[in-house]
UniProtKB/Swiss-Prot annotation:
EC number: 7.5.2.11, 7.5.2.7
Membrane topology: Peripheral membrane protein
One GO location term (cellular component): plasma membrane
PROSITE patterns, per database record: ABC_TRANSPORTER_1, ABC_TRANSPORTER_2, MGLA, RBSA
Catalysed reaction equations from the record: D-ribose(out) + ATP + H2O = D-ribose(in) + ADP + phosphate + H(+); D-galactose(out) + ATP + H2O = D-galactose(in) + ADP + phosphate + H(+)
Keyword ATP-binding: yes
Gene source species: Burkholderia ambifaria (strain ATCC BAA-244 / DSM 16087 / CCUG 44356 / LMG 19182 / AMMD)
Segments forming domain ABC transporter: 15-252, 263-508
Purpose of the protein: Part of an ABC transporter complex involved in carbohydrate import. Could be involved in ribose, galactose and/or methyl galactoside import. Responsible for energy coupling to the transport system.
Keyword annotations of the record: ATP-binding, Cell inner membrane, Cell membrane, Membrane, Nucleotide-binding, Repeat, Sugar transport, Translocase, Transport
InterPro entries, A to Z: AAA+_ATPase, ABC_carbohydrate_import_ATPase, ABC_transporter-like_ATP-bd, ABC_transporter-like_CS, P-loop_NTPase
UniProt name for this protein: Putative ribose/galactose/methyl galactoside import ATP-binding protein 3
Location relative to the cell: Cell inner membrane
Length: 513
């Protein structure tokens, strides 16, 4: 596939990266990569997690320094040694984790460290500070009071403040990393409107996202990376999503919805009755069988995560009974749950489930250290390493070695490490809370296959997901919640997105099947 459909007619690049390489200890993160951006365009950057997208953009933003290659702006070679150099060139980046101070006003956040001063240069000129912020908002056609404390804003409004901060440096290049991850549909529409305003002013936007439908709406071109290498640049119009996915993963993905096995005769592994906690969980009951994937669907705040955390002993309950393999058990702490063979993979794996500063080996062994202790005193380091390597092979975890820090792995591989941890604990009941959040399409496919394989081995799985196609693809049965209650149950063969949404927005229980 050609890098550009018609290079001769293409306008001059605002910024151009060629032959860029970057190496970290044990990892070639980038190898001979290229990318260009034109004024007034939205250029999507896509690839599986670990493909090198963020590394390439961090080099452009001055966070990392390249080992080789060239960066040109307006046709002139430039060196970007640090973020200040990038800002001086008019390059801004909006990180997925926003970098704002809640106790300061909007205007103070925008101009922090660069506040206009009064006559004697001692005191901040608050009037000018607020006027300058208002001028940027006028350019964005955004109605936002510069005096408002950032901590009082929604995530969407805070993101607009980050964009305004970047524009305050007269940014001509704006890098957006997964900007809609925490936004609802109305907020996404507002963000796209702002992007349209920026394009009209000639700002070039690099847009990193896994959401194909969004890119269809706003991207002009898309560059695909794979394994730290450049694959292709194609126009978004006229390029199918299947073609882009194939470029991203280097293979065709199995995206067909499969017919789930009949597990209705299997033994019941987990039974929950009358589970309640305030208004968050209200008289919830369900059964889960061996070899079954039970999908939990519902809108944000429906109570799905709360149920999982309650069963796992992470949160107290007011009432309810839990039976494991037919026996009533008492679960007051996660240790109690694990002792009964229940594992929980949190939706926030980086804070709950993964020690990102530790290596792969120690993360896998973290919850099972006792089995590696010899004579009550010494860790059997060799057995721990061999066990970790066995799970790395079994789950196809992509890592140079088990000594690699977990923070350097992609989201999909981090998720596999957490799964390995619970498999090592011999958990046969597993709660997966948003198991594919923040990972790319290729890694999602691998997680799906892994869940299917675990179910085929007899593991009993609850999968909580906000992505309806994912729930429909993976579940053998689907439980729907609304406002803390189970409002319905659907067999996989009868389930549709429409039926799920009907149940997710009603307050009374029913069964559609």
């Amino acid at each position: 596939m050609q890098p550009d459909p018609n290079p001769a007619a293409a306008p001059a690049a605002l910024i151009e990266l060629t032959g860029v390489s970057k190496r970290f200890p044990g990892v070639q993160a980038l190898d001979d990569c290229r990318f260009d951006l034109r004024a007034g365009e939205v250029h999507a950057l896509m690839g599986e997690n670990g493909a090198g997208k963020s590394t390439l953009m961090k080099i452009l933003a001055g966070v990392y320094q390249k080992d080789g290659g060239e960066i040109r702006m307006d046709g002139r070679a430039v060196e970007i040694d640090d973020p200040r150099a990038a800002q001086a060139l008019g390059i801004g980046i909006i990180h997925q984790e926003l970098n704002l101070m809640n106790h300061l006003s909007v205007a103070q956040n925008i101009f922090i460290g660069r506040e206009p001063r009064g006559r004697f240069g001692v005191f901040v000129d608050e009037d000018k500070l607020n006027r300058d912020a208002a001028a940027i908002f006028a350019r964005m056609r955004l109605d936002l009071d510069p005096r408002t404390l950032v901590g009082r804003l929604t995530v969407a409004k805070q993101q607009m403040v980050e964009i305004a901060k970047a524009l305050s440096f007269d940014s001509r290049v704006l890098i957006m990393d997964e900007p809609t991850a925490a936004l609802n549909n109305a907020e996404i529409a507002e963000l796209f409107r702002i992007i349209g305003e920026l394009r009209a002013h000639g700002v070039g936007i690099v847009y990193i996202s896994h959401k194909m439908d969004e890119l269809r709406q706003i991207a002009d071109r898309v560059t695909v990376m794979r394994d730290g290498k450049y694959v292709a640049t194609v126009p978004m119009a006229g390029t199918s999503m299947d073609a882009i996915i194939a470029m991203m993963v280097g293979r065709q993905l199995d995206t067909e919805f499969r017919t789930p096995p009949d597990t209705s005769a299997n033994d019941v592994a987990l039974e929950v009755r009358g589970l309640s906690r305030g208004r968050a969980i209200r008289d919830v009951g369900f059964t889960l069988r061996r070899g079954e994937i039970l999908g939990f669907a519902g809108l944000m705040g429906a109570g799905r995560t709360e149920v999982a955390r309650a069963v796992f002993g992470a949160d107290p309950v007011d009432a309810g009974e839990i039976r494991v393999h037919g026996k009533t058990v008492t679960i007051r702490t996660p240790a109690d749950a694990v002792a009964h063979g229940i594992g929980y993979l949190s939706e926030d794996r980086k804070h709950f489930g993964l020690a990102v500063g530790m290596d792969v080996q120690n993360n896998i062994a973290l919850s099972s250290m006792r089995r590696f202790v010899r004579r009550g005193l010494f860790l059997d380091a060799r057995q721990m390493r061999d066990t970790a390597q066995s799970y790395v092979r079994q789950l196809a975890i992509r890592t140079p070695s088990v000594a690699q820090p977990a923070r350097l792995l992609s989201g999909g591989n981090q998720q596999k490490i957490v799964i390995a941890k619970w498999l090592l604990r011999d958990c046969d009941i597993l709660f997966f809370d948003e198991p594919t959040r923040g990972i790319d399409v290729g890694a999602k496919s691998e997680i799906y296959k892994l869940l299917d394989a675990l179910a085929a081995e007899g593991k009993a799985i609850v999968m909580i997901s906000s992505e309806l196609p994912e729930v429909l693809r993976m579940s053998h049965r689907i439980l729907v919640m609304c406002e803390g209650r189970v409002t319905g149950e659907l067999r996989a063969a009868d389930a549709t997105q429409e039926k799920i949404m009907q149940l997710a927005t009603q307050r009374e229980s029913t069964v559609l099947s």
